[in-house]
Regions:
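Extracytoplasmic cysteine-anchoring/structural motifs
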Residues: 20-325
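Bacterial N-terminal signal peptides that target proteins for export
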Residues: 1-7
Length: 325
């Protein structure tokens, strides 16, 4: 899509929506041709639990406004801005020329701690390499909308969505493994063919690579599987940029002691991953007993999962122990 920059359109910088009166960015020249769009941008509703994936760290909202001009999009450069997400919401008021079609792009992430490169002017986000594993700062949300602006006030609600699959790994034999002399303190994962580029206006994920997270301290929250008589210790939690269609991939999981010198690695094939879905791999993963469960559930809402995939257990019986000097 060809894009040109529309410069000098705004007479003043945009103010975020507060209780005080807003200035008119364009003076009074437009008169009745002026419209105001009042946007309420929100994260999806999520329950309050100790599980990861509640979006609490996504406190910075970046957004850009584009004016449609035939097959072109004209960036309204002075309307590119940021807002603070409070309690999962941000309110924005923007005054624009009426009777014109606009597109908005949104991205919400962890302010100052985000592992993503955001080019909001070109509505593109890239996943940086070597992201630390098991960090909730890796969670983020995106959204877009089209507005045919009319004269007067145009209220709109926009709900952002997560472009990632959340991959969780948990084990029921954490303590017995520790008692045997291997105290797991850090983990990492490598995934074949995860995506690294997101178009905020289309939602398209591209540039797939074999992606590997670096070692990170194991998660501390509750493992997101309910209704089980067995308690699982969280070993790994990571966000992977995926498409809206379910894909299967190979996941290589490595756990290490505090020094990182004693490691154990295992691979799982045919693991299902899908945007905005949670995939759980759990069982007695560290001992000789072989019990593996894999579930995938939509929108992070169903803690029990809706799609069991027992074939994974049959495909993954090799367990490699490595001791590095």
């Amino acid at each position: 899509m060809k894009k040109r920059y529309l410069l000098g359109l705004c007479a003043a910088s945009m103010l975020l929506m507060t209780s005080c009166e807003k200035d008119n960015l364009f003076g009074n020249a437009w008169g009745e041709k002026e419209g105001s769009v009042n946007l309420t941008v929100a994260l999806p509703e999520m329950g309050v639990t100790r599980a990861y994936g509640e979006g609490k760290n996504a406190t910075r909202l970046q957004y850009a406004v584009f004016r449609e001009n035939g097959n072109e999009l004209l960036l309204l450069e002075n309307l590119t801005n940021t807002a603070e997400m409070k309690d999962g919401k941000a309110s924005i008021e923007i005054k624009l020329e009426a009777n014109v079609d606009y597109q908005f792009a949104f991205w919400a992430d962890a302010n100052g701690n985000s592992p993503y490169s955001v080019d909001i002017n070109n509505h593109v986000v890239k996943v940086n390499g070597g992201i630390g594993a098991n960090s909730e700062n890796n969670d983020a949300f995106y959204g877009n909308c089209k507005v045919s602006l009319q004269a007067g006030t145009n209220p709109m609600n926009v709900t952002l969505v997560r472009p990632f699959a959340q991959l969780n790994i948990g084990t029921s034999d954490f303590e017995s493994t520790k008692n045997s002399g291997f105290a797991i303190a850090k983990t990492k994962v490598k995934v074949q063919q995860a995506y690294t580029k997101l178009n905020l206006l289309t939602g398209e994920a591209t540039d797939a690579v074999d992606y590997e997270f670096s070692l990170g301290a194991i998660p501390t929250g509750n493992f997101p599987v309910a209704g089980e008589s067995v308690t699982y210790t969280y070993l790994s939690m990571n966000y992977l940029l995926m498409t809206a269609d379910k894909e299967t991939t190979t996941v290589t999981f490595t756990c290490a002691d505090e020094a990182g010198s004693n490691t154990r690695t295992r691979s799982y094939s045919n693991v299902p991953l899908q945007r905005n879905w949670r995939t759980n791999i759990y069982g007695d993963l560290m001992t000789n007993g072989f019990s593996i469960n894999v579930t995938i559930s939509p929108n992070f809402a169903d803690q029990n999962g809706v799609d069991d995939d027992p074939a994974i257990a049959e495909d993954n019986k090799e367990w490699h122990d490595q001791k590095q000097n």
